[in-house]
Every structure is written in C-alpha cells, then in structure tokens.
Amino acid sequence: MCIRDRADLLAEARISQFRNDGASWHANRINEPTDALSVLTQTLDNGRVLLANGVLSVTIEADGTISSLLDEEHGRELVPAGTRLGRYELLKDEPAVWDAWEIERESLLMANAMTGSIESVDTENGAARVRVRTADDDTVITTIITLRPGSHTLDFHADIDWHERERFLKVALPLGIVADQATYDCQYGLVRRPIVKNTASDEAKYESSTNRFAIIGDAGYAAAVINGSVYGSDASPIAGNAAEGRDSGTMFRLSLLSAPTFPDPRTDIGSHEFDWSVVTDATVDRALGAAGVLNAPVLHDVPDITPLASIESVNGTVVLDWMKLADDGSGDLIVRAYEAAGGQADATLHICPALAGASVHETNVLEGDNLATDLPVALQDGRQNAEGATLHFGPFQLATLRITR
C-alpha cells in the first residue's frame, strides 16, 4: 500500500480484488453508511415479513423461507410458484464406498425439508435483517437474511450447530429462470455445466464444484448465486405445468454439510458458519463484484491508504487478482491481472505516487523475462512507464507484470 505520513484506521474493513464501485484493492468499511433510503420492513398477515429497498421486494414466510423475490426494476419474480427460497433440506447420505467422499446420485432425489421460524426483524445502517431459527432434533441453524439499501443482492449468513449421522445438508435456492446450462466461476475463467441432463456425461455432473459463484440466465435475464464458504452444488429443472409441457425455473442447491461415520464418526460435528447471496439482474461483472466482497476476509484496524497499483478497465472486464513483492528479493512489485468475462478487453495501469517514475514490463508466470513466443502479451510495447500503461487482453488471458522503480 502507498505510504502516507498519517492515515486513518478503519476498525473493520474488507479489501477485495474486484468491486463494481471502482474501489478494488481499497480498504472498504464494513456496514458503511449510505445515502440510499433505508430498507422498508413491514409485518404482514400470518407472521410474514416484507422487505423492500426500491430495487427488490422480498416476502419471508413465518417459517423463515422466502416465497417471493421480486426484481421491481424488471418486474421479474424469481421464486417459482410452489417453491421456497432458502429452505434447508436433509438428505440421506449412505454411499456404498468412501463414506466421507462420495455423493450418491440417488441421495439428491430424496430430501426432507427442515422447519423454522422468524425470531426477530431489525435494521442497522439502513439495512434490514431477519433472524430465523431452524431446528431438527439436535441440529440448530440460525440464519440472518439481510437486504441492504439500493442493493440487487440478498445476503444470507448461517450459524449451524451440526449433530447428524449419515445426513447431507443442502439449502434450496430455486430461481424462476429456465436455462439448460449454468455458468460457474473457475480460476481465471468461467465454465458451463448442464442443468438439463441429456446424456450420460451430463447425468454424471449431478454435483458440481461451485467456486465463488454460479450464474443462471435466459436470453434476457440472469441471476447469480454467490458462494462464500462452500464448494459444491447441484442444479436441475423445476417442472412446470405438465399440460403446457414446459419448466418453470431452475432448482439450485448449495451443499453445506455431511455427516459420514467413517473414517471419523464425528466428522464435521459442531459449529460452522456459511455465507451466500442471491444477486438479481446479474452480469459477470456484478457477480464478480459480489463474490469479491463476500469472499474477502474482515480485517481489523486497517489503514485507509491507496493501493500500490490499480487497473482501470476501459472496456471489458479486467481484474487485478493479486500483487506481491518479486521472489528474487529485488523489491520489484509483481502484479497479476486477467480478463474475466471471456471477451476482448482494454485497461490502463495506475500506480500510487510513492512509485512515481517506475517502469513496467511483462514477465512469464515465474516472473522471468523469457516470454513464450506462442502466447499473447497484454503489454504491447515492451518496457514502458508504469503510470498509464495500456493493456490489451483476449478472452480469459492473464498477464504477470513487474513494476520496477
């Protein structure tokens, strides 16, 4: 970070690689006050609660599940009729072999819904928070559902006291979007996996690695599930009106916990925390931004200072993934950036005043100068002044840059 004579300390902050507000790699306060209007909360009949922020309208049933998630800007209802978003499900988990590793396809077809109740509704810094308690015998789940002012994102935080045997816990996130594929995050790229299973190969992908997010979209609209702390999920069509012969949406379920009995009969028993979010009107940029914030750790007593380097996307989506000192001990700054959406992109490199006059050149991934001749380069003109250097990226291209004073 850039050195100053004096910098304010932020009590709690996050530093994320990519943000939609242009504050990537800056320390951003937790629960920072906003000028947007506070979220409206209203108690409805039968113990239901309505949350509205002018962008989203959320109806939470008395059992803590969500019966309506309405994108008011687009008039799009995202919870299919007859389903509930945020419902916990217990599945049988008794694989024939590798008890703590395998997931049987058939186990995903038999789920028992857990029941819960709303405990409290409160507001803080304009955000509305609904606290839900869900229990099954000795297992207790406390969920905080949060809607923030002006946000396209509905956030979930779960504290789970897990005491099950041979059970598998998922949370159901049905979306009123009909799609045959979902787009998943992977390192330095995206990967598409089937929702509609047409072949034996498709059927074998009944559980998928989720990384930080999955985007489900049709030709005109998409939503994303942002994943903060779990790695597996399954996606399948939701059957609609049989007479009309069409589906009504996509069932997306995050895998939270299992309870194998071998080799350790107490595997995962105890307390766990999980975070996930649902982003409406999702784009790759919006999903990346939400994923960056959700996955960034909360830091304490963080100096409010300028990052040593930053990248301004001129067009397309370029992410500055990390920065570090060079391995050779020279004191040079190494920066890794990549194109994240699968298209062409142009960007401009910026450095903080402490590095004024520094030069930049592109290296290979091992920080060496011998670039491969059969790979594209992002820095077209070789070594040059670091401030304002122009970068060009192809789809999912990554670049390693060395900044030298």
Where in this protein do the model-derived segments appear?
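C-terminal (or distal) subdomains of carbohydrate-active enzymes
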Residues: R4-R405
